[in-house]
Amino acid sequence: IRPGDKVAILAEGSNAWIISELGLFYAGAISVPLSVKLEESNDLLFRLRHAEVKAVFVSKYQLPKIRRIRAELPQLEQVIVLGHIPLESGETAYGTLKRLVRDYLSKNREEFLKIGQAIQNDDYATITYTSGTTSDPKGVILTHRNYTANVEQALSRVDIPPYYRTLIILPLDHCFAHVVGFYIMIACGASVATVQIGATPMETLKNIPQNIREVKPHFLLSVPALAKNFRKGIESSIRAKGKFTEGLFHRALRTAYAYNRDGYSKGSGWRILLKPFVALFDAVLFRKIREAFGGSLKFFVGGGALLDAELQRFYYAIGIPMFQGYGLSEATPVISTNSPKYHWHR
């Protein structure tokens, strides 16, 4: 892999995914992150051809897709497989690659580091493809400076102390997960974890609650559908505790809604009288809900679709505000967001 080469990543989110992309950047290569939802017949084949991909990092679960179309990709020279699975000709195990890299660096470290140091702001970092719902997908080219600038802009709105942890639940192929999921964490010296991959997508989803309790994240990325599922889980758990607890929970929500109002006017005017009741409900109910998220969760960052105001009020009431970001891939992607200091959910 040489500077300027395009290398795809087709894998479920994992630490190895992040390490692979950072390794590509050090080598001066261009990352082409791809969604695991792509089917090989059209969508995947088009992207690999259009981007002129020379190598691909692929998980063992996605490998069959590559095998079925490899004969149609004469430019594809290397297939690096994440996970343990019997390999075919022309495929290299991720573990083998790591050993080869260690051996190479033991003799050529300075020469290799010069490649990364020579990268310029306007050099391409990633090519991210749009969905292509009305025509062929478009490759959005983002430079290294696009990413670093958006990281700086994001950190002007939200403080990330070095002790913060996050668990990335969303797919890593989108630049939202890149910037808000791990690049701002790297910039601040904070910690990133990824969900334990299951044999099926459903098994991976089932790992999320346990992984949250293990990691004890300080913030989580979300999309409205995921936030709604979390809320359904919370309300289902409350109902299971009986009518009294359910009634108390709804009274607590109404009180918190009245106290918080639209967020920015929290506790204003006569609402200050509700503060002791909100504190009581927090101690009795809401704190226990937060413990199910690991006990350290400060906020969510939402994106990807319109976030319902009622959903924002709900999470603000239980003590885990959900900040709504807006952006687009071409903007790397964050354009605007509310934040702890500027929170309004009208």
Model-derived regions: residue spans:
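Conserved AMP-binding/adenylate-forming
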Residues: 1-38, 169
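ATP-dependent adenylate-forming carboxylate-activation enzymes
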Residues: 11-12, 29-46, 60-65, 192-214, ...
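Short hydrophobic alpha-helices that are characteristic scaffold elements of the AMP-binding
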Residues: 21-27, 50, 186-187, 316
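Conserved ATP-binding loop and adjacent catalytic segment of the adenylate-forming AMP-binding
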Residues: 193-196, 273-276, 295-302, 307-346
